[in-house]
Amino acid sequence: MGHIRQSYLENTLDNEKRKKLIKVISHDVERIERLITDYSQMLKDEATLSRAKMKKIDLLNVINTVVEDFNSDLLNSNKNIKINISNSNLNGSKVNVWGVESKLEQILANLLDNAVSFSPSDSKISVMCNIKKKDAQLIIEDQGPGFNEKNIDKVFNRFYSNRPEKFGEHSGLGLNIVKNIIELHGGSIIASNQSGNKKGARIEVLLPLYN
């Protein structure tokens, strides 16, 4: 079918129009493929977590591992973004949560990937870990444009995307997948913009502590 369509385009349109139309079609195909991939991953995550046995996970170890990987990759990029970890309020305390380690890594990786994609060059992303009552609190702040205040309550909706074209294509499933995984861990996630003179997005994740 694809060959027939391409042959039709080649025989009915002039060269310039044909190139533009093929580019549009290719772009749409890539978007649909990305959507299918993300949706399939979401279903896989839900199925995996429904079967998985949760155990005690050292959240600080997860954070250190994921951030180290990201900083290593960012060294080879041209954006010059640095991810900093702050857990000074813990005074050396361990932060253990109930969870599936690979999925906790996925949560942080997805959130950092989102933060990096919106961050300008020569900026910093902060990852903070604290204990808030009976939960582990994970906060990620970037120095990007932040969320659109009018639609901030929709950012975790399935297929919702308000990403400007300059920040690249997006399926609208990334944050929804993260939210699903967090809720399957018994946690919650909140999106907001930083307050005061600070500019950028703020994500707060709460996960039940292991007792």
Question: Which residue stretches match the model-derived regions?
Answer:
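Conserved micro-motifs of the catalytic ATP-binding
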Residues: 13, 47-52, 92-99
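Short alpha-helical segment of the dimerization/phosphotransfer core of two-component systems
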Residues: 27-32
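A conserved beta-strand-to-alpha-helix junction within the catalytic ATP-binding
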Residues: 53-71, 87
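Short conserved segments within the C-terminal catalytic ATPase subdomain
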Residues: 73-88
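Short helix-loop "hinge" at the ATP-lid/N-box region of the Bergerat-fold HATPase_c
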Residues: 115-116
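Short conserved segment of the HATPase_c
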Residues: 147-159
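Conserved glycine-rich
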Residues: 187-188
